[in-house]
Amino acid sequence: MRALLLSGCLALVLLTQQAAAQTLLVVGDSISAALGLDTSQGWVALLQKRLADEGYDYRVVNASISGDTSAGGLARLPALLAEEKPALVVIELGGNDGLRGMAPAQLQQNLASMAQKARAEGAKVLLLGIQLPPNYGPRYIEAFSRVYGAVAAQEKTALVPFFLEGVGGVQGMMQADGIHPALAAQPRLLENVWPTLKPLL
């Protein structure tokens, strides 16, 4: 009888621990979807391992889709929030907006709306900033790069100013297409995010 009681208590503790796990939702594009790599090799998978190794009870949901834009992320977000109920939302979008020459003002509006929707559901928000290559022209690049800081200030979200710091344009860090981070870059991407993400946990 005592053994059964102890077994029941242990099961209750385990169930309670499982129920306590919070969700971290990543909404991104091909960079976070680890295009060209196995998803288990991407920075988001490395983040899940880092959280476990450091004792953070989080379940990471990677809702990143290759080719996605800020408009696509905004359209998908309400259903993701309802289904996953995240405590923290990481937004990594805008690169495809820039590559398509979309208006920075529209990008800013979309990202701000995503942050507002996430915060309305009680989630903290971390925005990962993207910069464009120099061939897009200084005026467009400057307007684009200002978007992320403006959204972070307006919506009071955490910000990584340049997610691809030490990766973009660096020899050996990019795949052959020159756009997507290589396997060697994935740990660096995690390190770019971690110092800003950790205080939000």
From Swiss-Prot:
Family annotation (InterPro entries): Ester_Hydrolysis_Enzymes, SGNH_hydro, SGNH_hydro_sf
Protein keywords: Hydrolase, Secreted, Serine esterase, Signal
Gene3D superfamilies in the record: SGNH hydrolase
CDD domains for the chain: Lysophospholipase_L1_like
One family name in Pfam for this protein: Lipase_GDSL_2
Signal peptide span: 1-21
SUPFAM superfamilies documented for this protein: SGNH hydrolase
Catalytic reaction annotation: a carboxylic ester + H2O = an alcohol + a carboxylate + H(+)
Subcellular location per the Swiss-Prot or TrEMBL entry: Secreted
Main location: secreted
Name of this protein: Esterase TesA
